[in-house]
Amino acid sequence: MSGRVTARRRVVRLTPAGEIRRQDTLAVEEPLEIRIGGQSLTVTMRTPGSDIDLVHGFLLSENMIGAAEDVVSARYCAGTDEQGRNTYNVLDVELRRPVPVRTRHVLTTGACGLCGKTALDEVRAVTRFPLPAHGVTLAADVLADLPATLRAGQSVFQATGGLHAAGLFTVDGTPLAVREDIGRHNAVDKVIGWALRENRVPAHELVLIVSGRASFELVQKAVMAGIPILGAVSAPSSLAVDLAEEAGLTLVGFLRGETMNVYSGAHRLRSVSAGTRTA
């Protein structure tokens, strides 16, 4: 599977000095069809690798499972490319308890037909792991260092410049799992799936860091896994902030260097400075 994460392609690089023809390294993007008991559930475009974790995280986010033991088996189905090699692009999952399967059963795609308020109500209603109002806290200086630790684990991004990343950390800054993917939601599903399979869900004492922006979908996935703190290198969306406030999640954006914007749940962060001012 590791050989399928990157691919080499010819590229013409245009520079002020002229054309340079060379090989370039690209991140692989392939479809993964998820089936439940042989019935197609959804197809996601992903970077191959950690597919079992991805599926566990996705099913948890969709409230189809709540623990690792809810999955009896997950196996690749037969499927070959033009060279006769297994594509490893179809995963069939057997669940311990039957659940209704609707094709493309998702809470968080643009095609799901949910308005913002309805989406908030549905996520709040179905989460199995409500976030505790108090409990874990995180030092702001520790949080500020986590994006650099995340980048250090992005080996494929360093080779391609084309992948998102997500990481789970302890509140003292120890990295537990870092995953990369062409889709930021897949990267989050991969680390959440890892946590589920390691019996660390609900993840009430962990921190989720993502390499890009914080969308509603990523906040929803954090809430469904019981993660109390989500930090993003870029901006959150308005709906992401709405959901974070509703769920009691600490949402931090523009996490760059020593500065950051805390959009909700500031009570979980311990500042190194006692000074506070309003702009």
Curated annotation (Swiss-Prot):
Active site: C112
Subcellular location: Cytoplasm
Gene Ontology process terms (BP): Mo-molybdopterin cofactor biosynthetic process
Major place of residence: cytoplasm
Pfam families: FdhD-NarQ (PF02634)
Keyword line: Cytoplasm, Molybdenum cofactor biosynthesis
Transmembrane annotation, as ranges: none
GO MF term list: sulfur carrier activity; sulfurtransferase activity
One Gene Ontology term, aspect cellular component: cytoplasm
PANTHER family with a match to the protein in the record: FORMATE DEHYDROGENASE, SULFUR CARRIER PROTEIN FDHD
NCBIfam families: fdhD_narQ, PRK00724.1-2
Free-text function comment from the UniProt entry: Required for formate dehydrogenase (FDH) activity. Acts as a sulfur carrier protein that transfers sulfur from IscS to the molybdenum cofactor prior to its insertion into FDH.
UniProt record similarity statement: Belongs to the FdhD family.
Name recorded for this polypeptide: Sulfur carrier protein FdhD
Organism: Nocardia farcinica (strain IFM 10152)
This protein's encoding gene: fdhD
